[in-house]
């Protein structure tokens, strides 16, 4: 659950990978999820929003990817050694279930009575799926192009032109200007402090692959 001083967001990571030892015994893979869901209040259980459920399914998709591996060499088993085109495929695929009426009806209900989610509420939720979807796609394209250009055009002698590059990308794909004082790249941890350098495009590409899976 979310708590003070805890890093925000949600992610999956591997504890150990699948490994077949010389004597034949198998070290089974272990994965863990870190999330920031709403805590229980008083004597009531934690009640997840649809967005939190989608986040859980996304990260659990990464976990399943790691734990169901059939490769017994630790360096390339599970989430390791996966091409960038596919690294987000399992997680995005599981997200799709959060938008299936049958799946939502199965996993949801009133926490006290067990009554299913009212059909009218379910219909409204599903109808909102693609609300402002174009803006979301443009945002992901902006992040992906910015990431690509930073790593492809970088010249050690000249240094990185971070804000200039972002401004040029935004002129191509953004429909809303950013304030001049904005410093979004400073918090773009995926490509600066995470493992997605030159690979952020995989999120949007995984949506295409998962839709066809």
Report the location of each language-model feature.
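Cation-handling catalytic/transport regions enriched in His/Asp/Glu
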Residues: 1-213
